[in-house]
From Swiss-Prot:
Record's keyword terms, sorted: Amino-acid biosynthesis, Cytoplasm, Diaminopimelate biosynthesis, Lyase, Lysine biosynthesis, Schiff base
Gene giving rise to this polypeptide: dapA
Protein's recorded name: 4-hydroxy-tetrahydrodipicolinate synthase
Main location: cytoplasm
Recorded GO MF terms: 4-hydroxy-tetrahydrodipicolinate synthase activity
CDD domains given in the database record: DHDPS (cd00950)
Organism per entry: Ruegeria pomeroyi (strain ATCC 700808 / DSM 15171 / DSS-3)
Lineage: Bacteria, Pseudomonadati, Pseudomonadota, Alphaproteobacteria, Rhodobacterales
Gene3D superfamilies, alphabetized: Aldolase class I
Residues annotated as the enzyme's active site: Y132 (proton donor/acceptor), K160 (schiff-base intermediate with substrate)
GO biological process: diaminopimelate biosynthetic process; lysine biosynthetic process via diaminopimelate
Catalytic activity: L-aspartate 4-semialdehyde + pyruvate = (2S,4S)-4-hydroxy-2,3,4,5-tetrahydrodipicolinate + H2O + H(+)
Site (Part of a proton relay during catalysis): T43, Y106
Enzyme Commission number, as recorded: 4.3.3.7
Cell location: Cytoplasm
Length: 290
């Protein structure tokens, strides 16, 4: 259903407003370069700084531009269950193929609270839901046992795992079953993630290097890890450079170098230090992008 290289899309801005023309260009470019899905309004899409109206506009524009050519997994997370229900129901109404729902952040629910939250979202709509487990940002870590309980619900179909713990893939295969879709949320470890049983990556770097990331994923899914390692060596400096500062800022800077969108971000994020720009430039050259 969902596999391969799927960019966690940036949200382009110009003069403080959504740049929808740039967003459409990005969607066309991503599909043309081989991305197998699109994931708007996640962390990399600056969802914390989007109004509800902007959030819904971005999802609607991406669904419209994709036009069914690749699946769209719409960001729909919140630390407020009622608000998350709104986002999931909107994603369904507008025609998204699935919703990506982060574990609630800041208010630190228990595992029982996580089950209640995701069960409510499962029951509110008919589209598949992908859990987004990123304890480094949300503070709450969904355990494999909790995920296994949720995987029994028919529309809880997978996880974007950004724990950085490769053992989790095997643990979650045991608790959720081999058909549960496991997608890496961390570019640098995506090779190992797939070797453990993952089937793709919701990627920051794929914003900038979609063809390379898509071909890397194709190699891993074909079991050609020698070829995948060649791609990994080419991409690793870029994975690292993009995340010297917040990854979405690095991705937008790199996209600006390619002429695809402005590097503008919303406060409290700021533009990159010159040293970070130089590192990204060098990594893009190493990857053959410049």
């Amino acid at each position: 259903m969902f596999k391969g290289s799927m960019p966690a899309l940036v949200t382009p801005f110009r003069n403080g407003e959504l740049d929808l023309e740039a967003l459409k260009r990005l969607v066309e470019w991503q599909i043309g370069e081989g991305s197998t899905g699109l994931v708007p309004v996640g962390t990399t899409g600056e969802s914390p700084t989007l109004s509800h109206e902007e959030h819904e506009t971005v999802v609607a524009e991406v669904v419209k531009a994709a036009a069914g050519r690749v699946p769209v997994i719409a960001g729909a997370g919140s630390n407020n269950t009622t608000e998350a229900i709104r986002f999931v129901q909107f994603a369904q109404r507008i025609g998204a193929d699935a919703a990506l729902v982060v574990t609630p952040y800041y208010n630190r629910p228990t595992q029982r609270g996580l089950i209640a939250h995701f069960t409510a979202l499962h029951d509110c709509a008919e589209i598949p839901i992908v859990i987004y487990n990123i304890p480094g940002r949300s503070v709450v870590d969904m355990t494999p046992a909790t995920m296994g309980a949720l995987a029994k619900l028919p529309r809880i179909v997978g996880v974007k795992d950004a724990t950085g713990d490769l053992a989790r893939v095997s643990q979650q295969r045991a608790s959720c079953g081999a058909d549960f879709i496991q997608l890496s949320g961390e570019d640098a470890t995506a090779l190992g993630f797939n070797a453990h049983g993952g089937v793709g990556c919701i990627s920051v770097t794929a914003n900038v290097a979609p063809r390379l990331c898509a071909e890397f994923q194709q190699a891993t899914l074909a079991g050609d890890y020698a070829k995948a390692l060649d791609y990994q060596d080419r991409l690793m400096p870029l994975h690292e450079a993009i995340f010297i500062e917040p990854g979405l800022v690095g991705a937008k800077y790199a996209l600006s170098k390619l002429g695809l969108c402005s590097e503008e971000v919303r406060s409290p994020l700021t533009g990159l230090e010159d040293s970070t720009k130089a590192a990204i430039d060098a990594a893009m050259k190493h990857a053959g992008l410049l």
